[in-house]
């Protein structure tokens, strides 16, 4: 196990180190088309994407076929659950059939919220996601070939260069211990709230699509897209009313491209809202959000001249 400055660096280390350690097999990385951008960037031009269904889940046989039919596969990557829509992936089923091909698993959104899947070779996580400080962590199973992709450093057994932030690491461990103690009960509470959001939003807001698997998903994430709505305007309207949410389809100033996750799923990419519940999110706050949302959507549609559509 090794620690990094943040979760992105942990994912980079997990992917690049696994590819470097298995260079004799090749340089290709088979991955789902909805992996975190950090995984896609680390794979570079050597990535082999596998399509997902409307819920954002890969087909096990299709994934394994991509591994077996591609020359020079050094590793595979499959997230435990999606960071935008919450859909869980069949990691254990894939891992059981991969043979000697190592499997890198992004568990960033899963740790502290749900049990980890079995079978991973290299696993990466981010302490911020369970309430800790900005610390990334990755673990390599005994016997898995992994080589540091960073310049040589005598510290941390050469895995990660630089001096580890011991204070933050200890704080991250303490936070994880506290979260895991109540993980099951908190997951059940959050799942009930998310189920309410999934049911009420399409009932109160016309032309909306709730995305992600309705059952096999993380307990704290729910995402939906509203037709005839600008995502940034919707987020701003909700922010003014005290609700901090994000948008999986928000464009970056450099690429002006929608979320690759939503595109891969074939989902509506405009007017997207991602809600992530926290341990201190109350039922009353969810009810208030469900009252405010239809009003904000109507206001944004009116501003765009789409209220009569």
PLM region spans:
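Pyridoxal 5′-phosphate
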Residues: 1-309
């Amino acid at each position: 196990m090794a620690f990094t400055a943040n979760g992105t660096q942990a994912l980079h280390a997990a992917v690049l180190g696994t590819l470097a350690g298995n260079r004799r097999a090749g340089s290709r990385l088979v991955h789902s088309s909805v992996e975190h951008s950090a995984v896609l960037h680390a794979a570079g031009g050597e990535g082999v994407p596998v399509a997902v269904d409307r819920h954002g889940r890969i087909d096990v046989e299709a994934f394994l076929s991509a591994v077996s039919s591609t020359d020079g596969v050094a590793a595979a990557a499959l997230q435990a659950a999606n960071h935008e829509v919450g859909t869980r992936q069949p990691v254990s089923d894939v891992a059981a059939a991969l043979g000697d091909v190592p499997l890198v698993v992004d568990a960033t959104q899963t740790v502290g919220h749900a049990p980890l899947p079995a079978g991973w070779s290299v696993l990466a996580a981010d302490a911020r996601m369970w309430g800790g400080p900005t610390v990334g962590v990755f673990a390599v199973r005994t016997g898995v070939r992994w080589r540091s992709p960073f310049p040589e450093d005598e510290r941390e057994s050469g895995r990660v260069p630089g001096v580890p932030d011991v204070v933050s690491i200890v704080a991250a461990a303490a936070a994880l211990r506290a979260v895991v103690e109540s993980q099951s009960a908190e997951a059940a509470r959050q799942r009930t709230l998310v189920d309410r959001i999934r049911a009420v939003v399409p009932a109160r807001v016309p032309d909306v699509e709730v995305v992600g698997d309705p059952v096999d998903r993380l307990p704290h994430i729910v995402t939906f897209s509203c037709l005839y709505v600008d995502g940034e305007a919707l987020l701003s309207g909700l922010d003014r009313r005290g609700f901090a949410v994000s948008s999986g389809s928000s464009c970056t100033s450099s690429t002006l491209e929608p979320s690759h996750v939503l595109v891969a799923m074939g989902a509506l990419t405009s007017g997207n809202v991602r809600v992530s519940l926290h341990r201190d999110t109350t039922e009353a706050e969810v009810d208030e959000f469900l009252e405010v949302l239809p009003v904000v959507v109507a206001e944004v549609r009116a501003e765009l001249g789409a209220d009569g559509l």
